[in-house]
């Protein structure tokens, strides 16, 4: 009797341990009984998205938390696959779905943070919810932002600057400082192709301004002569040193390499300018993209919760109502686009568990992955400079275009701190004729 009981208890214990061990390997989505009590497992089983495949269940059925064999991965297909749910991808997915019957799949490498206070609370940008040992901003947190490092900068002690990109549904609009800045028209008129000149796109800036409110009362702010003159000196020195100053030149000065002219003492400059007169470098339009709640608090308003919120997409990424032909798949890092000849036929991506998935494409693939990752995906897919792609081992070369991944121009925005004391401070601030040495 004692031997039998000992054996029975051992067997029960052995089966229980096997079940618990298997739970870490089986990804089956048991919706029939979420706590697994029918198998003697009292801890909740983690629910996963339905598109996530189940790993091989090679143990006996009675040891698996799911009472039936694991399903095969579903076959994904769409008319249009959009890669990247950032500022462009969210808008594109919304309007394509709203005004067509096309089946759309939107792939995003980051997570959906609609209920994450780190994203939704405007103060989350400054690290309000960080633990004490993580004194970093959201854009410095790899859970919310890509952290690609540039090549060493010989002009900055060979440091490798990091240019953060949003890693979330909403892209960088989910992690930025909530300032809206109207660009200077010179950049668009001098450097952008036909159809993208400032007057061509000005109407879109006007639409944005109609939808948001400035953080300050009124539309204008006083600036001192000292600030204006100091900035003009910086621009003049940049010109004399041969440094491009495209973003310091503006319409108001007739193309001269300085910023707004001073007049009538301290001038009044319109910061809410969509004519492109004000300089990107000199002035910011201090708009804050927020929604005020009934209790007086604010939440971040960004591309994700504006175009893909719960009115249009459910918590599992499936579209609702008119948007039922849209599917948003987050935590999906795109591997590459596959071609037959020069026609895109599928997109493969890797989920957060390392499983590889394929999406069949009937019409188009739209890459909305930003200025860094769009060329990266193209190159991995065999589109780019063949000599370079061959050197890094890209297997299938599709289209030879040496310009892919070249010609990036970024508005570099370093922070310079200067410490002066006594008479030097007054001279530094008042001697605008000579200006600071840079």
UniProtKB/Swiss-Prot annotation:
FAD binds at residues 79-109. Residues 1-26 form the signal peptide. It is found in: Virion. It comes from the Viruses. One of its GO terms (cellular component) is virion component. Belongs to the GMC oxidoreductase family. Keywords: FAD, Flavoprotein, Signal, Virion. Pfam families: GMC_oxred_N. It comes from Acanthamoeba polyphaga mimivirus. Its main location: virion. InterPro entries: FAD/NAD-bd_sf, GMC_OxRdtase, GMC_OxRdtase_N. GO terms for molecular function: flavin adenine dinucleotide binding; oxidoreductase activity, acting on CH-OH group of donors. Its cofactor is FAD. This is Putative truncated GMC-type inactive oxidoreductase L894. Gene3D superfamilies: FAD/NAD(P)-binding domain.
